[in-house]
Design a protein with these regions (language model features):
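C-terminal cap of metal-dependent C-N hydrolases
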Residues: 17, 388-442
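His/Asp/Glu-enriched, well-ordered alpha-helical/loop segment
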Residues: 11, 252, 256-262, 305-400
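Alpha-helical scaffold segments that flank or form the walls of functional sites
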Residues: 30, 78-153, 177-191
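Metal-coordinating catalytic core of metallo-dependent amide/deamination hydrolases
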Residues: 139-272
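N-terminal metal-binding scaffold of metallo-dependent hydrolase/deaminase domains
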Residues: 1-47, 58-59
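Active-site gating loops and adjacent loop-to-helix segments of metal-dependent hydrolytic enzymes
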Residues: 75-110, 164-174, 233-263, 336-359
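Divalent metal-coordination and catalytic microenvironments
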Residues: 11, 29, 34, 57, ...
């Protein structure tokens, strides 16, 4: 029988606020029935006799939230990354994405591919929660949901909706996309463990008005959130406006169907080029933006993350696999820092060698990966009292350092130089789902 009350001992690192990273050297983090009871130098009297997992000198961090990832694209990660301009992204879809995603009509193929995706996410990443795009195939989407649930992960998974502008036969009729989505919601509304459905129109150009209207109504009827893509590229924005003459901004194309936070929670990936109206919609509707620094940089674009955070827009991080070459949110953090500095240098510095930097640092990026995305799931993303207990143990020993260093320096090296072996253990909602030294916990 699993323990419901226990403690982890180690170097505890978290960011309850955007500005500051807190360090607790070899202290105790107590889990009490799936939530954090707090961090203590010594165990309080009521917890004196609980089990302690001793991770002395190892790092204990909150589980991270991948707010935008395409599970069926994992099989061709690292391919098609040399495209030279935005117009070639259509080639990327035609050559890589749509042909691969169309294969998931075969449940055996989906089972094999999703087994690898889930195994790698559990065992090699800091991710404990994710918002995941599947494909248009209902049965394959349920295969993915079950595998994630069986592994103990927490996630929202979306069956894609695409009833126009696709390729290779990878498209539903409008009637199919509506009926299959309703059937999928009926079959998954109670979830697979901690894995639940989320309405997922791929983006406006691939969804007719009829399907968008139906999806918006189903989101309310089944009380499930919505996720999609928004304002990723300038050509995409112009395409949307040419299709919908009655909108002022791209965001209106979702908002007119209740899918931009007016009726249910909404998550939008990228948002690199929001105009003033779209910006206010995001802010006032509490829409969460999934910042995907790798894929945006691949298109020569950088999201205005600092502006968003300072103005009160919610922001988390996404890998956007296969837009990023792997599932590592630690890499997403470092890239978010790099591109933030580049944006500041090119748009705000004004050739002033003494200009004050206004760009992301490690604490900020860590917050986005934990608390930033975690708020979409509830009280998730730090170790303050009553937050859900998601924790990942990181082991520095595998980096084979030749000298002793302060633990803060070791942590930086983990962030920038980690390997799959860096992940020692993982806990989700109080349940340990992975231990590197044990073959199976589920």
């Amino acid at each position: 029988m699993r323990e419901t009350v226990y403690a982890l001992k180690g170097i505890i690192v978290h960011t309850p606020t955007f500005e500051k990273m807190e360090w607790h050297e070899n202290e105790y983090l107590v889990c009490d029935n799936g939530v954090s009871a707090g961090i203590f130098k010594e165990l309080p009297e009521q917890y004196k006799d609980i089990k302690v997992y001793d991770y002395t000198d190892k790092f204990i961090v909150p589980g991270m939230c991948d707010m935008h990832v395409h599970a069926p694209q994992y099989g061709f990660r690292g391919m098609g990354m040399l495209l030279e301009n935005d117009s070639e992204w259509e080639t990327w879809f035609e050559k890589y994405s749509f042909p691969e995603e169309s294969k998931y009509c075969d449940n055996d193929y989906a089972d094999k591919a999703y087994s690898r995706f889930v195994k790698d996410m559990v065992e090699t990443t800091t991710t404990t929660r994710a918002c995941i795009f599947a494909t248009i195939h209902r049965e394959a989407t349920e295969i993915l949901m079950k595998k994630l649930g069986d592994a103990g992960m927490s996630a929202y998974v979306g069956k894609l909706n695409m009833d126009r502008n696709s390729h290779y036969g990878y498209e539903e009729t409008t009637e199919e996309t509506i009926s299959e989505t309703r059937k999928w919601l009926d079959e998954t509304k109670t979830g697979y463990g901690h894995v639940k459905p989320i309405i997922t129109p791929r983006y406006t150009p691939t969804c007719t008005d009829e399907s968008m209207e139906a999806l918006g109504k189903m989101a309310v009827e089944y009380n499930v959130p919505v996720m999609s893509h928004l304002s990723e590229g300038l050509d995409e924005i112009e395409w949307v406006k040419s299709m919908k003459k009655d909108i002022e901004c791209y965001g209106d194309a979702y908002d007119m169907y209740g899918m931009l936070g007016s009726t249910v929670p909404s998550l939008m990936a990228h948002v690199v080029f929001p105009d003033a109206k779209e910006w206010e919609l995001l802010k006032n509707r509490n829409v969460l933006v999934a910042h995907c620094p790798y894929s945006n940089a691949g298109g020569g674009n950088v999201c205005r993350v600092m502006d968003m955070v300072e103005d009160g827009i919610k922001v988390g991080l996404g890998t956007d696999v296969a837009g990023q070459q792997d599932l590592s949110l630690l890499k997403s953090m470092t890239m978010a820092i790099y591109v933030s500095k580049i944006r500041w240098g090119l748009t705000e510095r004004n050739d002033d060698p003494f200009a004050k930097r206004r760009c992301l640092n490690l604490s900020n990026a860590f917050y986005l990966a934990t608390m930033g995305g975690g708020q979409f799931f509830g009280k998730v993303g730090c170790f303050e009292k009553d937050y859900e207990f998601d924790a990942v143990v990181l082991d520095y020993d595998g980096l084979e350092d030749y000298r002793e260093r302060p633990y803060q320096d070791k942590f930086q090296r983990i962030v920038y130089n980690h390997t799959p072996r860096t992940v020692k253990a993982k806990f989700v909602k109080g349940t340990q789902i992975y231990d590197r030294d044990r073959s199976s916990l589920r």
